[in-house]
Regions:
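N-terminal glycine-/lysine-enriched basic segments
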Residues: 1-128, 134-158
């Protein structure tokens, strides 16, 4: 919206608007994938608790649970990274758009940073992720990048 409203005064606005739409499509897709991954992980956790015995069935069940927990952590990581991308694009738009649109760009950056933070929390609490896990570092870096982009833009319009 910010870029589209600034087309008359900002040469790159059309390209930024196209990028924003692509990010919006990614977000919608990831929301669906995240819901599916979470449901699959919950189901696998329930099945692991219901299972009896060990042997090959137990090993197969454990492997399946691990695979589903991995996916349940991977999707929020992608969402955290997407949040950083959105916050960065919103910050760029806020710096270059019409002045009347800057507050909307700052709000978009802040919302994206909040989304990155929430997604990072989901990576942190996922049972398949432990301290020192590279995914945790990536999620935290994305959260920080999103937060910094939003704060930079918010500070510039206060």
């Amino acid at each position: 919206m910010v870029a589209r409203a600034s087309r008359d005064s900002w040469d790159e606005a059309t390209g930024v608007a196209a990028q924003a739409l692509a990010l919006q499509d990614r977000a919608a897709s990831l929301a669906q994938v995240d819901a599916e991954a979470w449901e699959e992980a919950l189901s696998a956790l329930r099945n692991a608790g219901d299972g009896e015995g060990g042997g090959s069935d137990g090993a197969r069940r454990d492997h399946e649970l691990e695979r589903k927990l991995e996916r349940a952590a991977a999707v929020p990581l992608q969402i955290a990274e997407l949040g950083a991308d959105i916050a960065a694009l919103a910050a760029q738009a806020g710096e270059l758009c019409d002045g009347a649109q800057r507050a909307d760009a700052a709000a978009a950056a802040a919302l994206a940073a909040g989304g990155a933070r929430a997604a990072t929390h989901l990576v942190v609490v996922n049972l398949g992720v432990r301290e020192g896990d590279e995914r945790l570092a990536r999620a935290r870096a994305s959260e920080q990048a999103a937060s910094e982009a939003a704060e930079r833009l918010l500070a510039s319009i206060r």
